[in-house]
């Protein structure tokens, strides 16, 4: 890793009240999918995941990999193609169906009996299962434990007031020896209310520090023209590797 990649100077702001009280409903997230407002989706996959894939997988085979708030992340097929078992959770049924369609994967669907109105979509190959439900309802279903968690666009999308509950669920899903890759964003939260929400280093330490070793792998300037409409003039993505203490 290029040492300069972790030396980008990022100003840390205390978590602001405007974001602490911010709430997006599940229906608002569904509407984003219906309206095509999914700027968070990366058609070519996540570059930092590609770069640090060996660190994440650590040469192990047939891993169980969890994708919280998965959307139609193309990386799910990457892992499945490598022989890993992928499980995701997503509130938008449209997003899940688009994943299978765009990846040319046949699938089946069935109701989740423990969660009224929820469904699980499974690839015909059997190694991709996507749960269409509220992530916070997921503990009602026994989906097993995971060796790896890829958290990109998840912690930053969860309402700030729900972060502790979210983290508790994530850590409850980990197996011994897990590796948890977490991508968060830094920008001036006084200028943009989110989502994606600003997650400072102190918050990550507060959420994960008691149970995880926390290592920042890389910081990257990801500012694009579209971010100007947010009222900000910089945005930095930070990638953390969380491992068992």
Curated annotation (Swiss-Prot):
Alphabetical UniProt keywords: Acetylation, Cytoplasm, Methyltransferase, S-adenosyl-L-methionine, Transferase
Listed EC numbers:
2.1.1.67
Q: Which residues carry this modification: N6-acetyllysine?
A: 58
Q: Name one GO cellular component term.
A: cytoplasm
Q: Where do the annotations place S-adenosyl-L-methionine binding? A: 29-40, 69, 90, 152
Q: Which reactions appear under catalytic activity for this entry?
A: S-adenosyl-L-methionine + a thiopurine = S-adenosyl-L-homocysteine + a thiopurine S-methylether
List the PROSITE patterns hit by this protein, alphabetically. SAM_MT_TPMT
**Residues annotated as binding substrate:** 40
How does the record describe its quaternary structure?
A: Monomer.
Q: What is this protein called?
A: Thiopurine S-methyltransferase
Source organism lineage? Eukaryota, Metazoa, Chordata, Craniata, Vertebrata
């Amino acid at each position: 890793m290029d040492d300069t990649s972790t030396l980008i100077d990022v100003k840390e702001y205390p978590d602001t009240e405007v974001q602490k009280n911010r709430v997006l409903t599940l229906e608002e997230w569904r509407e984003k999918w219906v309206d095509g407002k999914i700027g968070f989706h990366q058609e070519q996959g996540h570059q930092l995941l590609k770069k640090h894939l060996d660190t994440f997988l650590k040469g192990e085979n047939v891993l169980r990999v969890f994708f919280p708030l998965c959307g139609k992340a193309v990386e799910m097929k990457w892992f499945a193609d490598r022989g890993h078992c992928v499980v995701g959770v997503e509130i938008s049924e449209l997003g899940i169906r688009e994943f299978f369609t765009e990846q040319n994967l046949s699938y089946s669907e069935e109701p989740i009996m423990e969660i009224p109105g929820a469904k699980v979509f499974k690839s015909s190959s059997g190694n991709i299962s996507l749960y269409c439900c509220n992530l916070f309802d997921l503990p009602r279903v026994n989906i097993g434990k995971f060796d790896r968690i890829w958290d990109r666009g998840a912690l930053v999308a969860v309402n700030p007031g729900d972060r502790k509950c979210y983290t508790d669920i994530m850590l409850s899903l980990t197996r011994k020896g897990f590796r948890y890759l977490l991508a968060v964003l830094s920008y001036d939260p006084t200028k943009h209310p989110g989502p994606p929400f600003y997650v400072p280093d102190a918050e990550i330490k507060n959420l994960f520090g008691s149970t995880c070793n926390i290592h920042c792998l890389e910081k990257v300037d990801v500012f694009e023209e579209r971010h100007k409409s947010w009222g900000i003039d910089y945005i930095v993505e930070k990638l953390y590797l969380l491992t068992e203490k």
